[in-house]
Curated annotation (Swiss-Prot):
Subunit structure, interactors included: Forms a heterodimer composed of AhbA and AhbB.
Cited Pfam families: AsnC_trans_reg2, NirdL-like_HTH
Signal sequence interval, chain numbering: none
Leading EC class: lyase
Cited function: Involved in siroheme-dependent heme b biosynthesis. Catalyzes the decarboxylation of siroheme into didecarboxysiroheme.
Species this chain originates from: Oleidesulfovibrio alaskensis (strain ATCC BAA-1058 / DSM 17464 / G20) (Desulfovibrio alaskensis)
Pathway: Porphyrin-containing compound metabolism; protoheme biosynthesis
Protein name from the UniProt record: Siroheme decarboxylase alpha subunit
Length: 164
């Protein structure tokens, strides 16, 4: 489901610097790749080409803004399902067809499919989960958060590991 680990792939100093910038402070400018290029010593076209290459190599999975969905009125939940092997592809295809699915993982457990779902209201979340169950015949365990904890993780790429 995922590509090779980043440490298994060659990253030069330009790639590492670009990754640091886009993780922590993507420029909100009319020409962000020109700003990134200037910061790392490349042209705008070179910076953009490197970001595209990192995305193609699956080192960058997603490039976009993160919002506090709770403050915007959205609701989310962690979901789990016991999916028989013969229904796996059908179930995963149905789950992934919904724009509110933000993560979807296969686990070695009785509840073998785990995913998170976000919607504009709690009613919409529950309605969508009910719809998935009706279409697939597979019940979904709905585990809404009682309290939200956000942990920010930035993977510092342009550091000398020997400096620690």
């Amino acid at each position: 489901m995922t590509g090779p680990a980043v440490q298994d792939q060659e990253l030069d100093q330009f790639d590492k610097k670009i990754l640091d910038i886009i993780q922590t402070g993507f420029p909100l400018e009319p020409r962000p790749y020109a700003v990134i290029g200037d910061a790392v010593g490349l042209t705008e076209a070179e910076a953009l080409a490197r970001v595209r290459a990192l995305k193609e190599r699956k080192i960058i999975r997603r490039l976009g803004a993160n919002f506090n969905s709770w403050k915007l009125g959205f609701r989310s939940t962690l979901c789990a399902a016991k999916v028989p092997e013969d229904k796996f592809d059908e179930f995963v295809a149905e789950v992934n067809s919904h724009v509110g699915v933000t993560h979807n993982y296969l686990r070695a457990h009785a509840y073998n499919v785990w995913f998170t779902f976000i919607g504009p209201s709690w009613e919409e979340v529950c309605s969508t989960l009910d719809s998935i169950t009706q279409k697939t015949g597979i019940p979904i365990l709905n585990l809404p958060a009682e309290e939200l904890y956000k942990i920010r993780v930035d993977f510092k790429m342009d550091e000398d590991p020997a400096a620690d």
